[in-house]
Amino acid sequence: MKKTNNILLLAAIAAAGFAFTSCEDQPDKFENTSGIPSVNYIRSLSGETQNRNDEEDRKYTYGELVEQASPQEVLCLVGNNLKSVYKAFFNDCEVTLNTSYMEDKTLILTVPEQIPTRVTDKLYLVTKSNDTVKYDFHIIIPAPTINNMSCEYAERGSVASISGKYLINDPSFPLAVKFTDKNGNQVNADIKKIAEDYTSVDFVIPENAAEGSIAISSIYGETKASFNYMDSRGMLFDFDGKTGLGNHGWHSRTIKSDETSLCGNFLQLGENGATLSEDAGWDDANFSFEYWAGSWDTPQNITSGDGIALFNLADFKDSQNKALKFEMYIPSSNPWQAGAMQICFQPLEQVTISGNAIEGYDNVAAANMYVFNGEGTGGDWAKGNWGRGMYRPWTDTGKFDTGDKWITVTIPLTSLIYDRTGAVTSNTPSKETDFASFTMFVMGGGITGTECSPIIKVDNIRVVPIK
């Protein structure tokens, strides 16, 4: 930007700062003024905005003049008599005005997230006496945003849903959900329903859909999902022989198939009426699945076969942009009402199957549950101060089931930040070698619920990119 514009920017920010201070100190003093407002120009207070007349790679910085913006961008109107504004609209979407950010010559507002039903490319400023001032301004509707899919392993021919934003169906350009067939070609799903607020779409998965990418296209562009349909990348436990891994700890958790199976065998936590107390007290015999790396050899084998260290099986590089995912089924007859599903990765220094030596490692721990019971003496981790995920969806309503269907659960690896009591800890897995062993244990977590006998079926435990 030119130097003169930088000076104007500083002036606008100073005026806005005065508005913040004066109005916040005396919030009850604000009164709309009389007269008609006017807008000289609009500045963006968000990071990246583009003028419609500029090159595609032009990126605006904080405070530059703009003629268009996207939903939820923050703008500063610069003009005169802006305290007379009683209501404001972009197209037919009303803006929520904060009087703390209104001054005579500046008005700071956020573009509504709502999608307009009538597009006029105008900003409307309305006074208390219903005088209306129009200002040319274009709202850029983004391409679809894809957040998640109800079940990434849903059967072909079944109905699934994707949640996101801007899932807009235009008569001239219908919304399309695209899967990939075995030849790498895109195949369209049959769309059944689109939410009125454009945040979800229900569809039938094509019969010829294969493992691969999913994309959604609208009149505003196309977006590829970060996840794949039937994603086998980073697979740790599929319980059908793909990785060959399963129980490898103190307990032989039930691995089976039945009429509810999603794709063959699954792991089951809780059965035969096993009860979780209100505080989900210790019951590893029924609610713990352990996979502890290593073997009974000396030195231990961590590079292949049953006992392979998980970091030698899947890619844990760039873990801040990855997540643990799995499919889960909780029948409505046995809802989950207590305890946290503690999801814990550990390095070889904390646990292995035998405790025998491992080439290249000075410190190797034997089998133990110190990270959960806190009864060890080998450091903070052995007292339970080691980061793990705490998945507890029942806390929203007091109980949780999946409605007798499979869903996909996503646990970002950046959320492995809780100690055994549910308190946040900075002692968390970060290096690739921190992801050698894995335990999934429903117990404790520092919350109290209702005594229950949940059945939790789990399949396709994997580590995949989410960004």
PLM feature segments, named:
Residues I456-V463:
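Extracellular beta-strand elements of beta-rich domains used
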Residues K325-F326, Q342-P347, N368-F372, G378-Y391, ...:
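Extracellular beta-strand ligand-recognition surfaces/modules
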Residues T117-S129, A209-Y220, T439-M443:
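Short, aromatic- and glycine-rich surface loops/edge beta-strands on solvent-exposed regions
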